[in-house]
Regions:
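Structural and coupling elements of P-loop NTPases
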Residues: 1-695
Length: 695
């Protein structure tokens, strides 16, 4: 592939609801640009984008794919992203590397939750954007309805650039609103001028007025001319669009049928004409030599630097670090410093990726997106720069996973293989996490949803030939006491010869601090227990609080006071006093009204106002306590509640079902609280075998 200068590059991410047609659009772009000799179909599993076996099997994208599309002497780096919410991390990574977005809307389904999430992501990253409405070949699709819905949501900045011409319900051409001209399709990719059907004149006038009003609002001069009734020329309209699309004050709407290659060439023309090249966008890092802001701004004349926005780990091809060049020109024989790790890396080769196909290139200019193979120290988010001018770039903010399940190997002996495989997968997928829960002797797999975790299991089997099974995780209960007790513990074995003797009298009471296992005090007078045995008593306590007498859970919030006892000058030992303490603890704990504590999480649930009642009702069923509700800037309600961790298992799926995918939630551990009696009884019964094993 040719090397492209910065001003001839467009980095465009495809966003939208799952099933809206992003991958089909990307495939049509690649075909029209001559990159493929056949138009692949998602259903047939032969598209450039969806090459992963899971994607082919499931007929939807699960990872971001890069397709560099050459068009009119411009390279359009198309980032095709998943639409399903479980793979939002892939989307966030792609957005961090993009300079503009196409939000794809299915004409059949209309504006969906994923459409609005895509818009919000563009707002967050201040990305220029266009809408592309697909499925125009379907007879009953209403383009006007989609435009009206978008305008209702986002106001007058919505500006349709094209609308369809239909004959007998068939999509046969389109009207160019800027040029006020009709075009008829003559074959899959061709078109010719045609008259605008009379029935469409009212819509042309309507959409042209919308566009002119949008253009007029971009400057005082245009506004004055608009009110004076002046017409803007095509050149003026195009120039205004180019300026104002880039600051998102105008958001064009295009349409077509990618499966029939219709409307796709128009979209590529608009991408090249209206979207910014990287050097029109800002990109700042911190110089590690001066600690001052380094304004890279994708300037090819500045010192070379880049950031890694994604990692791909392929069992056969190896590891690829996907970079965006922030400044300068990076060449295949460069040696760059991994600024995060302080290690130098020799590049050897540079690539651009066409789906799964790496194509070697000699250099990448500022703003371009490429790949480097086998960088040992480099991870997603790392910065690369010349050693003489190290620059650190901010890392993309990736969503935190809250759905988790317990996993274990199906076949004994596979544990190490699974751990190694998951290490590779977590380097590739930043929303996948592995957590070792030592207290409950389980390993947890965190992801963005059940579908995400199911695909992880499938990939482990397909790629790494290991089987794991997922199950409901155990919750980390704790044990404490509510009352006081006064007990003694005596460990005595004297059967001739050197015996064992330890005797303690102790008081147990709540310490009031549920974050600390125990507090130990000694108030022994007169040497009833010599001071040199106090550490042995504490060792006994330390051992006891690891597994409590009630249900073998860790103990918290206990104050233990050693106030008396006795010893034998020959038979007493540290071990004897430790054993005496263990006996005292078990009796004293059970005599002090022991209870199980369950973990409580502080949860924030963000939902559209219309779902607030349903969500609150569900939280109440989960024993949640709603603490407050607050509006946000996007017409949503943020519900704050304390909920037992035991009750949030599966919440991601439930919330998605209740809100049609529009709800989000987060939580963090808050504290421990006494569990209800029925929960305690059930848990104590279930843990009886562990208590017996601890005896």
């Amino acid at each position: 592939m040719d090397v492209f200068r910065t001003d001839r590059i467009r980095n465009v991410v495809l966003l939208g609801h799952g099933g809206s047609g992003k991958t089909t659009l990307a495939e049509a772009m690649a075909y029209l640009a001559g990159m493929t000799n056949r138009l692949g179909r998602v259903e047939d599993g032969n598209t450039v984008s969806d090459f992963d076996k899971e994607e082919i099997k499931r007929h939807f994208s699960v990872s971001t794919t890069l397709i560099p599309v050459p068009w009119d002497k411009v390279k359009v780096n198309v980032l095709d992203t998943p639409g399903y919410f479980d793979f939002v991390g892939e989307v966030e990574e792609a957005v961090s590397a993009a300079d503009a977005a196409i939000i794809v809307v299915s004409g059949k389904a209309g504006v969906q939750v994923g459409t609005q999430k895509a818009w919000n992501l563009c707002e967050k990253y201040k990305l220029p954007r266009m809408f592309f409405v697909t499925d125009m070949d379907v007879d009953d699709v209403s383009y006007r309805k989609v435009v009206e819905d978008l305008t209702e949501l986002y106001g007058k900045k919505i500006a349709p650039l094209h609308f369809p011409i239909r004959e007998d319900g068939k999509f046969v051409g389109y009207v160019n609103v800027v040029k006020q001209a009709g075009r008829r399709y003559i074959d899959k990719a061709g078109k010719e001028p045609c008259d605008i059907p009379e029935y469409l004149n009212e819509y042309l006038e309507k959409y042209h007025d919308i566009l002119m009003e949008s253009v007029a609002e971009t400057s005082e001069e245009f506004m004055d001319r608009y009110f004076e009734g002046d017409e803007f020329s095509v050149t003026e309209v195009s120039a205004a669009l180019a300026t104002n699309v880039q600051d998102a004050s105008i958001v064009p709407v295009c349409m077509g049928s990618p499966i029939n290659l219709r409307g796709v060439s128009n979209l590529l023309d608009d991408i090249c004409g209206y979207f910014p090249s990287p050097d029109k966008r800002s990109c700042n890092g911190i110089s590690q030599k001066t600690n001052e802001i380094f304004e890279a701004n994708y300037d090819f004349a500045k010192t070379k630097s880049a950031y890694v926005w994604k990692t791909i780990v392929d069992p056969f091809l190896g590891k690829y670090s996907l970079i965006k060049v922030a400044s300068g020109v990076i060449k295949s024989d460069d040696t760059l410093l991994n600024v995060d790790k302080g290690e130098e890396e020799r590049l050897n080769k540079l690539y651009v990726l066409e789906g799964s196909k790496p194509i070697e290139v000699p250099e990448l200019h500022a703003g371009d997106i490429g790949a480097i193979a086998k960088l040992a120290s480099v991870q997603t988010g790392d910065s690369l720069a010349a050693k003489a001018a190290p620059v650190l770039y901010p890392k993309a903010v990736i969503s935190t996973p809250y759905t988790y399940k317990r996993y274990k190997a199906v076949n004994k002996g596979d544990e190490d293989k699974i751990a190694q495989a998951l290490a590779k997968m977590t380097s590739e997928d930043k929303t996948l996490r592995v957590v070792n829960d030592a207290a409950n002797r389980q390993t947890l797999l965190y992801g963005m949803g059940d579908q995400h975790l199911d695909i992880v299991v499938s990939k482990l089997k397909e790629r790494y030939k290991v089987d794991v099974e997922l199950s409901k995780p155990k919750v980390a209960f704790r044990e404490t006491i509510r009352k006081n007790s006064d007990v003694e513990g005596k460990h005595k074995k004297q059967s001739g010869g050197h015996g064992q003797y330890g005797h303690v009298k102790m008081r147990f009471e709540p310490s009031g601090d549920l974050e600390t296992p125990y507090v130990f005090e000694q108030v022994v007078v007169g040497g009833a227990v010599p001071k040199n045995y106090f550490p042995a008593v504490e060792k006994g306590l330390q051992e006891c609080v690891l597994k409590g007498p009630l249900a073998a859970y860790p103990v918290v919030g206990v104050k233990a006071t050693l106030y008396d006892g006795s010893y034998h000058p020959v038979d007493s030992s540290e071990m004897a006093f430790k054993m005496a303490t263990i006996l005292a603890f078990k009796k004293g704990f059970m005599d002090a009204s022991p209870v199980l504590l369950e973990p409580i999480v502080s949860m924030k649930v963000t939902v559209p106002d219309k779902y607030t009642g349903d969500v609150m009702g569900d939280l109440n069923k989960r024993r949640g306590r709603v603490l407050g509700m607050n509006p946000d800037h996007a017409g949503n309600t943020i519900i704050e509640a304390d909920v037992p961790q035991l009750e949030i298992y599966g919440y991601s799926t439930t919330l998605r079902s209740m809100t049609g995918g529009s709800g989000d939630f987060s939580y963090e551990f808050a504290r421990y609280e006494q569990a209800p009696n029925d929960i305690q009884a059930k848990e104590i019964e279930a843990r009886a075998s562990k208590l017996e094993a601890a005896e």
